[in-house]
């Protein structure tokens, strides 16, 4: 039995994403260090970093999801709107709506701009689609 690729979505056009160089390096390091424990989401995060347009760390990225951003997004399947803060794993706390970048939702949101949507597959092989409604950095 072959394993389905976590980020397998050949028919879907992925939106362009923008990430600061220093964050991309830290996120690549995180994906590498977590590859054994969380192989699917680590691979997804690494793929997102590979395709990201990198900008200088002092760039003005208003409206772009980055680490520490407060994000309002809509689950396109359910219509549910959520407000979260995107954080590193050690800062995650779902009761405070602090979502780790090392979750499928967190990895999907990083680098997106307001109005962009992304489709991805969860570890349970469910397809999800999220649209970013607002970002404050």
What are these model-predicted stretches?
Residues 47, 51-69, 74-78, 82-91, ...:
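Extended, charge-rich alpha-helical interface modules
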Residues 68-70, 77-130:
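Non-DNA-binding regulatory cores of transcription-related proteins
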Residues 2, 8, 32-33, 53, ...:
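Generic serine detector
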Residues 3-11, 90-94, 133-137:
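Contiguous hydrophobic segments
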